[in-house]
Amino acid sequence: IRLTLGNFNMNGGGFKENTSKTDLYFTGTVRDEFILNKGDIITPLTEQSLGLLGTTARIPESGKYIQSQDVALVRCKEGLLDHNFCYYLISSSIVRQQLSAAAQQTKIRHTSPEKIKDCTVWVPDFEVQKNIGRILTDIDNKIAINRRINDNLPMLGRSLKGAEARLVA
């Protein structure tokens, strides 16, 4: 599946399946370097909706998604930048502000991997990065669990009403 800007969740960040397009499946030959793996970090290079630059997402499954020209794959230097810390760093307000200020064009704005690398940020030592990244990832995982629970509450309510009706009858 070809990644698009529709794979970025504008409300809170993260990955979402793109259901707005029908031409997402690519059947041609793809070089291995463009096939993404579970956990890879991606960020958009084009801003079709205000606030999209600096959004980050993680690839949910290996071998299913391919990188497109509007999406950058973020690679962290081993031992220098923690993968989880980087995910949150790119989506931080300080990086997003810099990307927005440096974006080209006025209507549909663009950035580049070089402009992302040029952002000025404070980065703690690697062990602190790992701790921060782990804590933020744990919080996001708990939020995802709570959302799934909330999504199931209406079904639980219907089940309870059905059970209540059977008890009364």
Locate each region found by the language model.
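Specificity-determining recognition surfaces
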Residues: 92-121
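Sequence-specific dsDNA recognition surfaces
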Residues: 1, 6-41
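Glycine- and charge-enriched low-complexity intrinsically disordered segments
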Residues: 77-98
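Glycine- and aromatic-enriched periplasmic loops at the membrane-periplasm interface
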Residues: 69-71
